[in-house]
């Protein structure tokens, strides 16, 4: 099992639009062979304060949204990226200025899990 994570720095003025794009997606990936699940994680702008010993809000921090997809194999994910459905899912380009910088794409293999049999 692998997890593909796309870490995306979204400009603060576009956060609602970015979230709406995922809420309104057509779920093409969900029907792809080997697809397990998809999650979108919203950044929580907090940091640990050594002065107070607790977590405090940090609105100045550039957070990253994380779009995670779980796949049975790397080959299943690669096949998705080469499919017409992938091209269709990514055809509606976001407006200029939506992103505060480049995204970071990472692929990890699940080593251990408390809820999956790996």
Residue ranges and their predicted role:
Residues 22, 26:
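Short amphipathic alpha-helical/adjacent loop interface patches that line ligand
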Residues 41, 106-108:
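Solvent-exposed beta-strand sheet faces enriched in polar/charged residues
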Residues 28-36, 54-64, 68-106:
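An amphipathic, aromatic/His-enriched active-site/gating alpha helix that lines ligand/cofactor pockets
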């Amino acid at each position: 099992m692998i997890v593909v994570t796309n870490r995306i720095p979204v400009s603060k003025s576009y956060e609602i639009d970015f979230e709406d794009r995922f809420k309104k997606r057509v779920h093409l990936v969900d029907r792809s062979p080997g697809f397990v699940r998809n999650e979108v994680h919203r950044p929580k702008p907090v940091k640990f304060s050594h002065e107070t010993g607790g977590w405090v809000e940090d609105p100045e921090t550039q957070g990253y949204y994380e779009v995670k997809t779980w796949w049975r194999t790397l080959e299943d994910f690669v096949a998705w990226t080469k499919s017409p459905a992938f091209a269709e899912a990514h055809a509606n380009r976001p407006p200029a200025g939506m992103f505060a910088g480049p995204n970071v794409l990472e692929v990890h293999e699940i080593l251990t899990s408390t809820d999956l049999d790996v």
